[in-house]
């Protein structure tokens, strides 16, 4: 269900005192991505600043994404929380809005034990919406181990994982352990897209695709067509851009890049702060060289 290039979209804000939601800009950005051939849309993830969106803003962003996409590609909505009941509320709302699936980050800060993780993810999967797990140890302080993922994958509604550990050995093991299930392993790091595809992964939930969806889609489609040489060329063309997306905390650089390209972006919300002048110039040079 979820494969290919799926941009983790930014949430554009106005440059007003509240950094209020720019729904028209959101609509424009999504339509632009769809016109460039992306295979899915992922609102309200880390890149979409979900941590600083209110519940009502989550509803607005996901609802608008579903409306604009209009069935052309899947919408995978970020609905995770370290509060299980809040995650249930967000996930139920996304389902009611028409999202095709829910992206559920591993609970952060409170570091649940194994049985707590199983109960948390199972409670969400029992809402009868396809669930994609999200493993990002650098943000959560906890790594979803391959054997745990394999156990969760036996639930019929747990259909994949966004894997952002950066560990190709672990990613390969998850693919190996879930081969008997209808389960997609999706890279959570742009730079790992081609390696993950090579070991049997399904695609990437991408930051860089906000900036250059065309080349990201081209790399994926070249690989799927068996043209590894072309996929490698595009991988290395994209590499400087991929690195530039992490010269500061995500999504600070990608929002600035999108703004520099003339699309809707606006500020990041506190406690994140905007890119400083030196890094902005560094990013500008990468964009100019990228072409």
Swiss-Prot record:
InterPro entries per the UniProt record, alphabetical: Aldolase_TIM (IPR013785), DapA (IPR005263), DapA-like (IPR002220), Schiff_base-form_aldolases_AS (IPR020625), Schiff_base-form_aldolases_CS (IPR020624)
Domain of life assignment: Archaea
An example Gene Ontology biological process: diaminopimelate biosynthetic process
Catalytic residues identified in the record: 134, 162
SUPFAM superfamilies documented for this protein: Aldolase
Entry keyword set: Amino-acid biosynthesis, Cytoplasm, Diaminopimelate biosynthesis, Lyase, Lysine biosynthesis, Schiff base
Site label Part of a proton relay during catalysis, positions: 46, 109
CC per GO annotation: cytoplasm
Pathway connected to this protein: Amino-acid biosynthesis; L-lysine biosynthesis via DAP pathway; (S)-tetrahydrodipicolinate from L-aspartate: step 3/4
Catalytic reaction annotation: L-aspartate 4-semialdehyde + pyruvate = (2S,4S)-4-hydroxy-2,3,4,5-tetrahydrodipicolinate + H2O + H(+)
Localization, UniProt: Cytoplasm
Gene Ontology MF terms in the entry: 2-dehydro-3-deoxy-phosphogluconate aldolase activity; 4-hydroxy-tetrahydrodipicolinate synthase activity
Keyword Protein biosynthesis: no
EC class name: lyase
Keyword Repeat: no
EC number: 4.3.3.7
Binding site for pyruvate: 47, 205
Protein role: Catalyzes the condensation of (S)-aspartate-beta-semialdehyde [(S)-ASA] and pyruvate to 4-hydroxy-tetrahydrodipicolinate (HTPA).
Family (UniProt): Belongs to the DapA family.
Quaternary context: Homotetramer; dimer of dimers.
Protein name per its UniProtKB record: 4-hydroxy-tetrahydrodipicolinate synthase
Naturally occurring in which organism (per UniProt): Methanoculleus marisnigri (strain ATCC 35101 / DSM 1498 / JR1)
């Amino acid at each position: 269900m979820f494969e290919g290039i799926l941009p983790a979209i930014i949430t554009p804000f106005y440059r007003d005192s509240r950094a209020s939601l720019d729904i028209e800009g959101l609509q424009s950005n999504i339509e632009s991505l769809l016109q460039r051939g992306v295979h899915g849309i992922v609102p309200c993830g880390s890149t979409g600043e979900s941590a600083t969106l209110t519940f009502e803003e989550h509803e607005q962003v996901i609802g608008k994404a579903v409306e604009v996409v209009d069935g052309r590609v899947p919408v995978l909505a970020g609905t995770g929380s370290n509060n299980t009941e809040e995650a249930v509320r967000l996930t139920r709302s996304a389902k009611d809005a028409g999202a095709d699936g829910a992206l559920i980050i591993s609970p952060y800060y409170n570091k649940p034990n194994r049985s707590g993780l199983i109960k948390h993810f199972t409670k969400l999967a029992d809402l009868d919406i396809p669930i994609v797990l999200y493993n990002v140890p650098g943000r959560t302080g906890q790594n979803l181990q391959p054997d745990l993922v394999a156990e969760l994958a036996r639930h019929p509604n747990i259909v994949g994982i966004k894997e952002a550990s950066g560990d190709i050995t672990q990613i390969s093991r998850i693919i190996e352990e879930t081969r008997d299930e209808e389960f997609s392993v999706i890279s959570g790091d742009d730079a790992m897209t081609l390696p993950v595809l090579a070991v049997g992964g399904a695609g990437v939930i991408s930051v860089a695709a906000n900036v250059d969806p065309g080349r990201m889609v081209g790399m994926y489609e070249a690989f799927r067509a068996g043209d590894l040489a072309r996929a490698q060329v595009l991988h290395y063309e994209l590499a400087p851009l991929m690195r530039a997306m992490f010269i500061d905390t995500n999504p600070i650089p990608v929002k600035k890049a999108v703004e520099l390209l003339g699309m809707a972006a606006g500020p990041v919300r506190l406690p994140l702060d905007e890119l400083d002048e030196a890094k902005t110039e560094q990013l500008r040079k990468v964009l100019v060289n990228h072409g």
